[in-house]
């Protein structure tokens, strides 16, 4: 049996941590993993009692490791930190709210025994999400796949995935961008991969920390990170604008004097111009973040520490 590292991102999850740990202990006994596994909880700057609960759990079980950030660095940074510190042959990333079913661990491990190195978990349905969220999620993946020539994402793939230690080494070494889309990296890294389906359960407690603003910023950064198509819009828009200018010039020479139409057309072109400037600004901000080369995360405290990169 391969050694398992389970990476769990934690941000203000005091309502679910004990439930998650107890549920895993039950699954662990059923699967007979024994000590051949580790739970890595990454505390992403929680402001509630999450860290206190994790300290108690870690004292009870030496296979529970806790990595605590100096502040909130974000969900993606937490998962990257967990992968950086994981020592298992198989690394599974999942959330603490039990929406990612622990019962999926057994079929995931079975796939690794078959020789797969990347397992993407695909939601068939989400019991806690409304129709609008499900629609926007599908639209997000379709837009990314339409714009990107670098990666084709599995629709409804989530931050619930599993990778081999070899894939983890590639991520540790080569995928250190400051603007991250980890599930995109996992699906674009190559190696032998497959998918498994699951139904997202209701949250075991607490509330989702993803606001509309965070989701919008996440979508924009993902498009910038995986597609250069928005930059090419400038070329396409310039070509269309040039043709429009030629047509207006010909119309003026032929006696066309509808200046309101011309002014309206110029207003549209200026609006598009400012949009393109904004798009370029997003790309420049990403490049600037890379030039500053600040750390993806800062660890303030570790409990039961093992591997550290």
Model feature map: region roles:
Residues 1-130, 308:
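Structured catalytic core of nucleotide-sugar glycosyltransferases
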Residues 9, 27-31, 42, 111, ...:
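Histidine kinase transmitter module recognition
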Residues 69-71, 75-85, 102-180, 202-216, ...:
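Acceptor/aglycone-binding surface of glycosyltransferases and processive sugar-polymer synthases
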Residues 183-309:
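Hydrophobic helical membrane-anchoring modules
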């Amino acid at each position: 049996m391969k050694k398992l590292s389970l990476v769990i991102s934690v941000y203000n999850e005091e309502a679910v941590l004990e439930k998650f740990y107890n549920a895993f202990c039950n699954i662990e006994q059923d699967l007979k993993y024994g000590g051949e596994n580790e739970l890595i909880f990454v505390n992403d700057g929680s402001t509630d009692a999450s860290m206190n609960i994790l300290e108690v759990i870690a004292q009870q079980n030496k296979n529970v490791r806790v990595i605590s950030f100096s502040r909130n660095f974000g969900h993606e940074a937490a998962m990257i930190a967990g992968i950086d510190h994981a020592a298992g042959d198989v690394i599974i990333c999942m959330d603490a709210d039990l929406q990612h079913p622990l019962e999926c661990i057994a079929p995931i491990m079975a796939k690794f025994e078959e020789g797969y190195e990347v397992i993407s978990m695909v939601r068939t349905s989400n019991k806690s999400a409304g129709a609008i969220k499900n629609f926007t999620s599908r639209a997000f993946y379709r837009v990314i796949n339409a714009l990107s020539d670098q990666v084709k994402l599995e629709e409804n793939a989530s931050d619930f995935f599993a990778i081999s230690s070899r894939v983890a080494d590639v991520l540790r070494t080569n995928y250190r961008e400051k603007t991250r889309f980890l599930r995109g990296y996992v699906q674009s890294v190559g190696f032998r991969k497959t998918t498994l389906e699951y139904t997202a359960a209701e949250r075991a407690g607490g509330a989702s920390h993803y606001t509309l603003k965070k989701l919008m910023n996440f979508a924009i950064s993902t498009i910038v990170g995986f597609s250069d198509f928005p930059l090419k819009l400038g070329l396409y828009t310039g070509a269309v604008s040039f043709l429009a200018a030629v047509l207006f010039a010909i119309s003026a020479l032929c006696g066309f004097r509808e200046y309101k139409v011309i002014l309206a057309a110029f207003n549209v072109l200026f609006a598009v111009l400012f949009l393109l400037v904004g798009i370029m600004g997003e790309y420049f901000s990403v490049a600037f973040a890379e030039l500053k080369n600040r750390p993806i995360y800062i660890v303030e405290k570790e409990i039961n520490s093992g591997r550290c990169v």
